[in-house]
């Protein structure tokens, strides 16, 4: 593991974006395509902003959305689909973006996501760690031995407090 220390969020975001771009370009050079998983949250603001400036052939990329609130419409300020569309997807021309759809039959959507995610190797995962050490809403104590690619989780109180504190919910 490599640890990079940065003085500002902007510097850290630029470092992360450059590394992500390098890995995506390597995957495209090797196999003609790249697959990445994107998360959201305040920790991703600067990374996604800087990633838009990187020279990546996005038309050879398929991206997957990591998580979403159940039954939250895409128009809601806290929607991760809205977050990714506004900050990333609407600015690059990906081959495909696979959203976590949480409206409708959630179990069917989870099965589809799992199938799609497992079709080929994921080249890059862009994730953050929350204030309570959650990774993609897998709050402690999460079952990290699950074989499911996507699961429904119950957020712990610290995670809920973080979401409100960051301004996603009023």
Positions of predicted regions on the chain:
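Ligand-binding beta-strand-loop-alpha-helix segment within the catalytic cores
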Residues: 59-126
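Class I SAM-dependent methyltransferase SAM-binding "motif I" and its flanking Rossmann-like core
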Residues: 136-170
